[in-house]
Amino acid sequence: MITTLTCPRCRAETVWEGNPHRPFCSARCKTVDLAAWADEEYRIAGPEAPSDNDENDRE
């Protein structure tokens, strides 16, 4: 049985077995997704963390 998955970046169907880029369909989608994290396009839900400037303002 061949297991397929949907690439989280481009939504293309790809095969899981033997895919060195999984869960992505290609190295390009993997790199584009990494760049999106680096550019802070994705965020993890939760309260906003205080910035370094906030600590200096309290002194």
From Swiss-Prot:
Its cofactor is Zn(2+). The lineage of its organism: Bacteria, Pseudomonadati, Thermodesulfobacteriota, Desulfuromonadia, Geobacterales. This is DNA gyrase inhibitor YacG. InterPro entries: DNA_gyrase_inhibitor_YacG, Znf_NHR/GATA. It holds the Pfam family YacG. Binds 1 zinc ion. PANTHER family: DNA GYRASE INHIBITOR YACG. It comes from Geobacter sulfurreducens (strain ATCC 51573 / DSM 12127 / PCA). Zn(2+) binds at residues 7, 10, 25, 29. One of its GO terms (molecular function) is DNA topoisomerase type II (double strand cut, ATP-hydrolyzing) inhibitor activity. Keywords: Metal-binding, Zinc. Belongs to the DNA gyrase inhibitor YacG family. Inhibits all the catalytic activities of DNA gyrase by preventing its interaction with DNA. Acts by binding directly to the C-terminal domain of GyrB, which probably disrupts DNA binding by the gyrase. Interacts with GyrB. One of its GO terms (biological process) is regulation of DNA-templated transcription.
